[in-house]
Amino acid sequence: MITISEAAQAHFVKLLADQPEGTNIRVFVISPGTAQAECGVSYCPPDAVEDDDIELEFNGFNAMVDEKSAPFLEDASIDLVTDQLGSQLTLKAPNAKMRKVSADASLVERIEYVIQAEINPQLASHGGNILLVEVTDDGVAVIQFGGGCNGCSMVDVTLKDGIEKQLLDMFPGELTEVRDATEHQHGSHSYQ
């Protein structure tokens, strides 16, 4: 469920040494499954452990995860990153905003998952996003660009060389094309 690097585990052990005995850590997601989802790590004293918590054992401490957050922390990782400015813990949870779908989920659900988990985070750096409108019977994924992507002069390159290539590689034999249904209007919102 959650991977914690050796460096991060050693850091947690050091931090927990200054806490009352029996204190562990809690990894959680606030507003899981939404665009506003935020992940966090906090101390978890023994009296804060809930009956339905999932307890994960690590080297020198345990991590508690509440039942509601658990599916959104699949494939999450915690690391201690050190650079010239010092060190900091990083928590990456690719499924926090949208629950990972099973391999036997519908094509639409699997495409929507990839859009939310992988494509939209990339487009967000330019203030953009895409929305899946439909998947036609002949395997065409129809998408709509929003935010900074609407009216952007590079939208065709983003569509063909980025989004379409990624989706066709991920869904061979199921998708044949990705088509843009956006009525593009260049404006101050558009990424240049």
Swiss-Prot record:
Q: Does the keyword Glycosyltransferase apply?
A: no
| Sequence similarity | Belongs to the NfuA family.
- Source lineage: Bacteria, Pseudomonadati, Pseudomonadota, Gammaproteobacteria, Alteromonadales
* Stored PANTHER family: FE_S BIOGENESIS PROTEIN NFUA, IRON-SULFUR CLUSTER SCAFFOLD PROTEIN NFU-RELATED
Instruction: Give one GO biological process term.
Output: iron-sulfur cluster assembly
Q: Which cofactor does it need?
A: [4Fe-4S] cluster
The signal peptide, as residue positions, is none
Comment on bound cofactor: Binds 1 [4Fe-4S] cluster per subunit. The cluster is presumably bound at the interface of two monomers.
Q: What protein does this entry describe?
A: Fe/S biogenesis protein NfuA
